[in-house]
From Swiss-Prot:
Pfam families: CheR (PF01739), CheR_N (PF03705). S-adenosyl-L-methionine binds at residues 76, 78, 82, 117, 145, 201-202, 218-219. The lineage of its organism: Bacteria, Pseudomonadati, Pseudomonadota, Gammaproteobacteria, Vibrionales. It comes from Vibrio cholerae serotype O1 (strain ATCC 39315 / El Tor Inaba N16961). One of its GO terms (molecular function) is protein-glutamate O-methyltransferase activity. The keyword S-adenosyl-L-methionine applies. This is Chemotaxis protein methyltransferase 1.
Length: 275
């Protein structure tokens, strides 16, 4: 029987490794998360215990195992149109404001996870184009994630009924999806065409991504240390065009982390504009 217990020291060593690789800070009480996320890899890589797996990951003995472990710890499924208001603000304020500049609008979804956020953006753009023909110039979305398996899932754009039921209205399901068989639905090509998925570790340089007018970095900073949060936010400020906007998660704040943005109160919600 495979042992799935780990010692406090093994947990601390793995936490240091994970923070060094992708900035995620687990804290003192997330052993259960490590066990649940990494235990399947013990069998997959034919190891005798979770302790052996953690040792091989931390020492770098097996590169494929390292990649799989980071992938498992950074994989999160999210909701369609999460919190609702960011997409209302995108449709009613940000897109019309950016359209006045008469140049292509570039948007970055900085942690695309299983694809719901960037595809929700794309649906919002298509809805604005339908309601206000001719308003928008070309709009493109760059969606990034550290997880290779999540990016593969995003590009496929196929979701089961459970995933589709998390925040997606029946009307949007009808308009923007097509049947994929086996009770699953696939994002239509006109939605997919707006989104380009790319790998990106938020601890590394963003310069190759180019400049953006709008950045969604929602429910990501909560996993990082204060120093890492500041580094990410200052890099994102440098990645925005003049007058660009940053949208964070509903419970996230810039307080004490960067002075590059000014708060903008919307109805509803709060967003941040580059100074």
């Amino acid at each position: 029987m495979t042992a799935i217990t780990i010692s406090d020291q093994e947990y601390r060593d793995f936490c240091r490794f994970l923070e060094s690789q992708c900035g995620i800070v687990l804290g003192d009480s997330k052993q259960y998360l490590v066990r649940s996320r990494l235990s399947p890899l013990v069998t997959k890589f034919k190891l005798s215990s979770l302790s052996d797996l953690l040792r091989d990951v931390v020492t770098g003995r097996n590169r494929d195992l390292r990649v799989a472990a980071v992938d498992a710890m950074t994989t999160n499924e999210t909701l369609w149109f999460r919190d609702s208001y960011p997409f209302t603000v995108l449709a009613d304020k940000l897109l019309p404001e950016m359209a006045a500049n008469k140049r292509p609008i570039k948007i970055w979804s900085a942690a695309s996870s299983s694809g719901q956020e960037p595809y929700s953006m794309a649906m919002t753009i298509l809805e604005v184009q339908q309601k206000r023909p001719g308003l928008l110039p070309s709009v493109s979305i760059t969606a990034t994630d550290i997880s290779a398996s999540m990016l593969d899932m995003c590009r496929a754009g196929i979701y089961d009924n459970l995933a589709l039921g998390r925040g997606l209205s029946p009307e949007r399901r009808r308009v923007f999806f097509e049947d994929a068989g086996d009770g699953r639905m696939k994002v239509k090509d006109n939605v997919k065409r707006l989104v380009n998925f790319r790998p990106q570790n938020l601890m590394e340089s963003y310069s190759l991504l180019g400049k953006f007018d709008i950045i969604f970095c929602r429910n990501v900073l909560i996993y990082f240390s204060p120093d890492m949060k500041s580094k990410v936010l200052n890099q994102m400020a440098a990645s925005l065009n003049p007058g660009g906007y940053l949208l964070l998660g509903a419970s996230e704040s810039l307080t004490g982390l960067t002075d590059k943005f000014e708060m903008v109160r919307c109805n509803p919600g709060i967003i941040y504009k580059l100074k």
